[in-house]
Regions:
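Anion-binding alpha/beta catalytic cores of soluble intermediary-metabolism enzymes, centered on
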Residues: 1-216, 221-284
Length: 284
Protein backbone atom coordinates (compact mmCIF):
# COMPACT_ATOMS: atom_id res chain seq x y z
CA UNK A 1 0.00 0.00 0.00
CA UNK A 2 1.43 3.38 -1.01
CA UNK A 3 -1.25 5.73 0.32
CA UNK A 4 -3.72 5.95 3.17
CA UNK A 5 -6.65 7.99 1.99
CA UNK A 6 -8.42 8.70 5.27
CA UNK A 7 -8.67 7.80 8.93
CA UNK A 8 -11.35 5.19 8.26
CA UNK A 9 -8.71 3.11 6.47
CA UNK A 10 -6.47 3.35 9.53
CA UNK A 11 -9.27 2.14 11.80
CA UNK A 12 -10.21 -0.67 9.41
CA UNK A 13 -6.65 -2.01 9.44
CA UNK A 14 -6.55 -1.83 13.23
CA UNK A 15 -9.77 -3.82 13.46
CA UNK A 16 -8.32 -6.49 11.16
CA UNK A 17 -5.27 -6.85 13.40
CA UNK A 18 -7.54 -7.55 16.37
CA UNK A 19 -4.97 -6.20 18.84
CA UNK A 20 -5.97 -3.94 21.69
CA UNK A 21 -3.31 -1.42 22.72
CA UNK A 22 -3.32 -0.57 26.42
CA UNK A 23 -3.77 3.17 26.95
CA UNK A 24 -3.09 5.02 30.20
CA UNK A 25 -5.54 7.93 30.07
CA UNK A 26 -4.41 10.68 32.44
CA UNK A 27 -7.20 12.70 34.07
CA UNK A 28 -10.09 11.65 31.79
CA UNK A 29 -12.46 14.29 33.07
CA UNK A 30 -13.56 15.98 29.85
CA UNK A 31 -16.38 14.85 27.61
CA UNK A 32 -14.40 14.66 24.36
CA UNK A 33 -11.68 12.44 25.88
CA UNK A 34 -14.23 10.11 27.47
CA UNK A 35 -16.20 9.82 24.22
CA UNK A 36 -13.08 9.21 22.12
CA UNK A 37 -11.84 6.50 24.47
CA UNK A 38 -15.28 4.85 24.57
CA UNK A 39 -15.49 4.86 20.77
CA UNK A 40 -11.97 3.43 20.32
CA UNK A 41 -12.67 0.77 22.95
CA UNK A 42 -15.90 -0.24 21.25
CA UNK A 43 -14.06 -0.42 17.91
CA UNK A 44 -11.67 -2.88 19.51
CA UNK A 45 -8.25 -1.31 19.09
CA UNK A 46 -7.58 0.02 22.61
CA UNK A 47 -8.03 -1.07 26.20
CA UNK A 48 -8.16 1.99 28.43
CA UNK A 49 -6.97 2.42 31.99
CA UNK A 50 -8.48 5.60 33.41
CA UNK A 51 -6.18 7.37 35.88
CA UNK A 52 -8.49 9.53 37.97
CA UNK A 53 -6.15 10.71 40.75
CA UNK A 54 -7.06 14.28 41.78
CA UNK A 55 -3.34 14.92 42.25
CA UNK A 56 -2.44 15.60 38.61
CA UNK A 57 1.26 15.11 39.11
CA UNK A 58 0.65 11.74 40.73
CA UNK A 59 -1.67 10.78 37.87
CA UNK A 60 0.97 11.65 35.28
CA UNK A 61 3.63 9.74 37.20
CA UNK A 62 1.35 6.70 37.41
CA UNK A 63 1.03 6.67 33.62
CA UNK A 64 4.82 6.79 33.24
CA UNK A 65 5.20 3.97 35.76
CA UNK A 66 2.71 1.83 33.84
CA UNK A 67 4.77 2.20 30.66
CA UNK A 68 7.99 1.43 32.52
CA UNK A 69 6.43 -1.68 34.05
CA UNK A 70 5.07 -2.85 30.70
CA UNK A 71 1.40 -2.47 31.56
CA UNK A 72 0.65 0.39 29.12
CA UNK A 73 1.46 0.69 25.42
CA UNK A 74 0.40 4.33 25.02
CA UNK A 75 -0.38 7.44 27.05
CA UNK A 76 -3.25 9.84 26.44
CA UNK A 77 -3.64 13.32 27.86
CA UNK A 78 -7.03 14.16 29.32
CA UNK A 79 -7.92 17.22 31.38
CA UNK A 80 -4.40 17.90 32.62
CA UNK A 81 -2.04 20.75 31.72
CA UNK A 82 0.47 19.62 29.11
CA UNK A 83 3.42 20.85 31.15
CA UNK A 84 2.55 18.56 34.08
CA UNK A 85 2.23 15.50 31.86
CA UNK A 86 5.37 16.33 29.87
CA UNK A 87 7.40 16.88 33.04
CA UNK A 88 6.56 13.36 34.17
CA UNK A 89 7.22 11.88 30.73
CA UNK A 90 10.62 13.56 30.54
CA UNK A 91 11.81 13.33 34.14
CA UNK A 92 9.90 10.98 36.46
CA UNK A 93 11.99 7.93 37.37
CA UNK A 94 14.22 8.47 34.36
CA UNK A 95 11.36 9.42 32.07
CA UNK A 96 10.26 7.90 28.78
CA UNK A 97 12.59 9.72 26.38
CA UNK A 98 15.60 7.49 25.60
CA UNK A 99 18.99 9.16 25.54
CA UNK A 100 19.64 10.77 22.17
CA UNK A 101 15.99 10.76 21.16
CA UNK A 102 14.09 13.88 20.15
CA UNK A 103 10.67 14.77 21.52
CA UNK A 104 8.70 16.12 18.60
CA UNK A 105 5.06 16.75 17.69
CA UNK A 106 3.56 15.26 14.58
CA UNK A 107 0.12 15.61 13.11
CA UNK A 108 -1.85 13.81 10.44
CA UNK A 109 -4.58 15.52 8.46
CA UNK A 110 -7.42 14.44 6.23
CA UNK A 111 -8.14 17.54 4.14
CA UNK A 112 -11.36 17.21 2.11
CA UNK A 113 -9.77 18.52 -1.11
CA UNK A 114 -6.68 16.30 -0.78
CA UNK A 115 -6.62 12.66 -1.97
CA UNK A 116 -4.77 11.14 0.99
CA UNK A 117 -3.67 11.65 4.57
CA UNK A 118 -0.95 14.26 4.98
CA UNK A 119 1.58 14.06 7.82
CA UNK A 120 3.57 17.03 9.11
CA UNK A 121 5.91 18.16 11.86
CA UNK A 122 6.50 20.16 14.08
CA UNK A 123 3.55 22.40 14.95
CA UNK A 124 3.75 22.40 18.74
CA UNK A 125 7.02 21.43 20.43
CA UNK A 126 10.31 22.48 18.77
CA UNK A 127 10.55 26.24 18.00
CA UNK A 128 13.53 26.12 15.64
CA UNK A 129 14.74 22.59 14.83
CA UNK A 130 18.49 22.24 14.49
CA UNK A 131 19.95 20.33 11.56
CA UNK A 132 20.48 17.29 13.78
CA UNK A 133 16.91 17.49 15.08
CA UNK A 134 15.55 17.71 11.54
CA UNK A 135 17.45 14.56 10.63
CA UNK A 136 15.68 12.79 13.49
CA UNK A 137 12.34 14.18 12.34
CA UNK A 138 12.89 12.65 8.90
CA UNK A 139 13.63 9.27 10.49
CA UNK A 140 10.62 9.45 12.82
CA UNK A 141 8.27 10.38 10.00
CA UNK A 142 9.61 7.60 7.80
CA UNK A 143 8.99 5.08 10.57
CA UNK A 144 5.51 6.47 11.26
CA UNK A 145 4.51 6.25 7.61
CA UNK A 146 5.76 2.67 7.41
CA UNK A 147 3.59 1.84 10.44
CA UNK A 148 0.66 3.48 8.65
CA UNK A 149 1.08 1.24 5.61
CA UNK A 150 2.97 3.68 3.39
CA UNK A 151 5.87 1.65 2.00
CA UNK A 152 7.89 4.50 0.46
CA UNK A 153 6.85 7.83 2.01
CA UNK A 154 7.57 10.99 0.08
CA UNK A 155 8.97 13.59 2.46
CA UNK A 156 9.14 17.28 1.55
CA UNK A 157 11.47 19.69 3.35
CA UNK A 158 9.44 22.89 3.32
CA UNK A 159 10.67 26.39 2.49
CA UNK A 160 9.08 29.44 0.88
CA UNK A 161 10.79 28.61 -2.43
CA UNK A 162 12.85 25.91 -4.09
CA UNK A 163 16.12 27.82 -3.81
CA UNK A 164 18.91 27.09 -1.34
CA UNK A 165 19.70 30.39 0.42
CA UNK A 166 22.52 29.92 2.91
CA UNK A 167 22.68 33.62 3.74
CA UNK A 168 19.08 34.28 4.76
CA UNK A 169 17.86 30.73 5.38
CA UNK A 170 20.88 28.64 6.43
CA UNK A 171 18.74 25.60 7.15
CA UNK A 172 18.17 25.18 3.40
CA UNK A 173 21.81 24.12 3.04
CA UNK A 174 21.07 21.43 5.59
CA UNK A 175 18.14 20.31 3.45
CA UNK A 176 20.58 19.48 0.67
CA UNK A 177 22.59 17.24 2.98
CA UNK A 178 19.46 15.46 4.24
CA UNK A 179 18.35 14.76 0.67
CA UNK A 180 21.73 13.19 -0.09
CA UNK A 181 21.64 11.07 3.06
CA UNK A 182 18.19 9.81 2.09
CA UNK A 183 19.48 8.84 -1.36
CA UNK A 184 22.07 6.66 0.34
CA UNK A 185 19.37 4.87 2.33
CA UNK A 186 20.18 6.31 5.75
CA UNK A 187 16.51 6.65 6.73
CA UNK A 188 15.27 3.42 5.21
CA UNK A 189 12.77 3.25 2.37
CA UNK A 190 11.66 6.82 1.64
CA UNK A 191 12.06 9.65 -0.85
CA UNK A 192 13.18 13.04 0.48
CA UNK A 193 13.40 16.30 -1.46
CA UNK A 194 13.79 19.98 -0.67
CA UNK A 195 13.72 22.79 -0.40
CA UNK A 196 10.21 22.78 -1.82
CA UNK A 197 7.35 25.14 -1.14
CA UNK A 198 3.94 23.91 -0.05
CA UNK A 199 2.43 23.95 -3.53
CA UNK A 200 5.28 22.15 -5.28
CA UNK A 201 5.22 19.58 -2.49
CA UNK A 202 1.54 18.78 -2.93
CA UNK A 203 0.66 19.77 -6.50
CA UNK A 204 2.08 18.18 -9.65
CA UNK A 205 0.58 21.06 -11.62
CA UNK A 206 2.60 23.60 -9.63
CA UNK A 207 5.78 21.65 -10.34
CA UNK A 208 4.95 21.63 -14.03
CA UNK A 209 4.24 25.37 -14.14
CA UNK A 210 7.53 26.14 -12.37
CA UNK A 211 9.45 23.71 -14.54
CA UNK A 212 10.83 21.87 -11.51
CA UNK A 213 11.80 18.21 -11.45
CA UNK A 214 11.31 16.47 -8.10
CA UNK A 215 11.18 12.79 -7.14
CA UNK A 216 8.24 13.67 -4.91
CA UNK A 217 6.34 14.75 -8.03
CA UNK A 218 3.92 17.00 -6.15
CA UNK A 219 2.64 14.04 -4.14
CA UNK A 220 4.17 14.46 -0.66
CA UNK A 221 3.07 12.24 2.20
CA UNK A 222 5.04 14.26 4.76
CA UNK A 223 5.78 17.95 5.22
CA UNK A 224 8.68 18.89 7.48
CA UNK A 225 8.39 22.56 8.36
CA UNK A 226 11.40 24.79 9.04
CA UNK A 227 10.05 26.09 12.35
CA UNK A 228 7.11 25.95 14.72
CA UNK A 229 5.54 29.13 13.32
CA UNK A 230 5.17 27.69 9.83
CA UNK A 231 3.93 24.36 11.15
CA UNK A 232 1.47 25.89 13.59
CA UNK A 233 0.00 28.30 11.03
CA UNK A 234 -0.50 25.41 8.60
CA UNK A 235 -2.04 23.29 11.38
CA UNK A 236 -4.60 25.95 12.28
CA UNK A 237 -5.28 27.10 8.73
CA UNK A 238 -6.34 23.70 7.43
CA UNK A 239 -8.76 23.26 10.33
CA UNK A 240 -10.20 26.77 10.20
CA UNK A 241 -10.60 27.15 6.45
CA UNK A 242 -10.54 23.59 5.10
CA UNK A 243 -12.42 21.62 7.77
CA UNK A 244 -9.54 19.17 8.04
CA UNK A 245 -9.81 16.19 10.35
CA UNK A 246 -6.71 15.83 12.50
CA UNK A 247 -4.70 13.48 14.66
CA UNK A 248 -1.83 14.66 16.88
CA UNK A 249 0.77 12.62 18.75
CA UNK A 250 4.25 12.95 20.23
CA UNK A 251 7.13 10.96 18.78
CA UNK A 252 10.50 10.07 20.24
CA UNK A 253 9.25 8.63 23.52
CA UNK A 254 9.29 4.91 24.36
CA UNK A 255 5.60 4.74 23.52
CA UNK A 256 3.30 7.04 21.52
CA UNK A 257 1.72 9.89 23.46
CA UNK A 258 -1.64 11.35 22.45
CA UNK A 259 -1.25 15.02 23.34
CA UNK A 260 -4.27 16.90 22.05
CA UNK A 261 -5.59 20.19 23.39
CA UNK A 262 -8.59 20.51 25.66
CA UNK A 263 -10.46 22.28 22.85
CA UNK A 264 -9.95 19.44 20.36
CA UNK A 265 -12.99 17.51 19.22
CA UNK A 266 -13.92 13.94 20.00
CA UNK A 267 -13.02 13.03 16.42
CA UNK A 268 -9.52 14.50 16.73
CA UNK A 269 -8.87 12.57 19.93
CA UNK A 270 -10.30 9.37 18.44
CA UNK A 271 -8.18 9.67 15.29
CA UNK A 272 -5.13 10.43 17.44
CA UNK A 273 -5.74 7.22 19.36
CA UNK A 274 -5.98 5.34 16.06
CA UNK A 275 -2.67 6.72 14.73
CA UNK A 276 -0.96 6.04 18.07
CA UNK A 277 -2.33 2.49 18.11
CA UNK A 278 -1.03 1.90 14.58
CA UNK A 279 2.43 3.07 15.65
CA UNK A 280 2.45 1.26 19.00
CA UNK A 281 4.79 -1.70 19.06
CA UNK A 282 6.91 -0.44 16.16
CA UNK A 283 9.01 2.08 18.12
CA UNK A 284 12.78 1.77 17.84
Amino acid sequence: METTQNFNEVVTRLKRKDIRRRVAVVSPHDKSTIEAVKRASEDGFIEAVMINDDNLQAAAEQAVTMVQQGTADMIMKGLIPSEILLKAILRYNGGLLPEGHLLTHTACAHIPQHPKLLFYTDAAVIPFPTHEQRIQQVQYMTDLCHAMGIKTPKIALIHCSEEVDERHFPYTAGYTEIVERAKHGEFGQCVVDGPLDLKTSCSAESLKVKGIASPIAGDADVLIFPNIEAGNVFHKTITLFNNAKLASILLGTRVPVVLTSRADTTDTKYYSLAVAAALSGTEK
